[in-house]
């Protein structure tokens, strides 16, 4: 039995759950929070080892256990949105709880992050280098990761500052969770499993994203069923909800089930 995660719910309306990415916490959703809370009952979740849940470390710290921890606090009939690593967790939660996830919103995420044969993704050397650097200098490594996330965006410096400011109020992530999170990004491949998901799934990708290449759009349209839709933000990198908040919210509102 997993320790219950702390969550925060604000607003009223249909249930909408947000899962953040690697190295940050639920504070990262600040730019879109007020708007969402006007239309939905929004639940903010810090993943195990991050933010307010930085003392909770499931053993082993793997995708299945992360998804189970989130599934335990998932309100019924939820729209589940995940960014980056959080999107990978969201996909696994939907596999565990298909009747409880009304819709998946997948933001700058992928069923497989690492580059492979005929698959665009992150070079494995980059993820391994981050793991090694974490031990030497935690805060500098997270800063470097944030810089890669913003790379390509016209407002890269502002984006990085916004992310840093939004996550500073919460406790720092546990180094073991950060290391295990990189391991998940390096090794997990959910391509076969997500093809079986039946709920509506909306992907939101940045054309300039160096972590989740926009080629993913071709895979979604070619290999996945008609319950999947994709929006590409032409000038965004890995954090479209920060760099292009207005466009992001318009698309999110248009494509989210009520």
Swiss-Prot record:
Q: According to its UniProt record, where is this protein located? A: Cytoplasm
What pathway does the annotation place this protein in? Cofactor biosynthesis; biotin biosynthesis
Question: Residues that bind substrate, according to the entry?
Answer: 22, 84-85, 145-149, 238
- Catalytic activity reported: 6-carboxyhexanoyl-[ACP] methyl ester + H2O = 6-carboxyhexanoyl-[ACP] + methanol + H(+)
The answer to keyword Transferase applying to this record is: no
What's one GO MF term for it?
Answer: pimelyl-[acyl-carrier protein] methyl ester esterase activity
Keywords (alphabetical) are: Biotin biosynthesis, Cytoplasm, Hydrolase, Serine esterase
> What family is this?
Belongs to the AB hydrolase superfamily. Carboxylesterase BioH family.
NCBIfam families from the xrefs?
bioH (TIGR01738)
Description of how the protein assembles with itself and partners: Monomer.
Indicate what this protein is called per its UniProt record.
Pimeloyl-[acyl-carrier protein] methyl ester esterase
By which gene is this protein encoded? bioH
């Amino acid at each position: 039995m997993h320790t219950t995660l702390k969550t925060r719910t604000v607003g009223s309306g249909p249930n909408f759950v947000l899962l953040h990415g690697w190295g940050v916490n639920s504070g990262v959703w600040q730019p879109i929070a007020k708007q969402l809370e006007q239309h939905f009952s929004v639940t903010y979740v810090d993943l195990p080892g991050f933010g307010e849940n930085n003392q909770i470390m499931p053993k082993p710290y793997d995708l299945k256990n992360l998804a189970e921890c989130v599934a335990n606090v998932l309100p019924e009939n939820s729209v589940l949105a995940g960014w980056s690593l959080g999107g990978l967790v969201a996909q696994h939660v939907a596999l565990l709880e298909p009747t409880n996830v009304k819709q998946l919103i997948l933001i700058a995420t992928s069923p497989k992050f690492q580059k492979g044969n005929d698959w665009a993704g992150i070079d494995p050397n980059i993820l391994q280098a981050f793991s090694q650097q974490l031990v030497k200098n935690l805060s500098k490594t997270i800063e470097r990761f944030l810089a890669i996330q913003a790379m390509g965006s016209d407002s890269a410096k502002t984006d990085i500052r916004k992310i840093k400011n939004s996550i500073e109020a919460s406790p720092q992530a546990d180094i073991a969770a950060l290391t295990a999170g990189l391991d998940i990004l390096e090794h997990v491949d959910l391509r076969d499993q997500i093809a079986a998901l039946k709920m509506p799934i909306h992907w939101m990708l940045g054309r300039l994203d160096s972590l989740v290449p926009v080629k993913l759009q071709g895979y979604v349209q070619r290999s996945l069923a008609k319950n999947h839709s994709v929006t590409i933000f032409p000038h965004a990198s890995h954090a479209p909800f920060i760099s292009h908040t207005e466009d992001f919210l318009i698309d999110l509102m248009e494509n989210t089930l009520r």
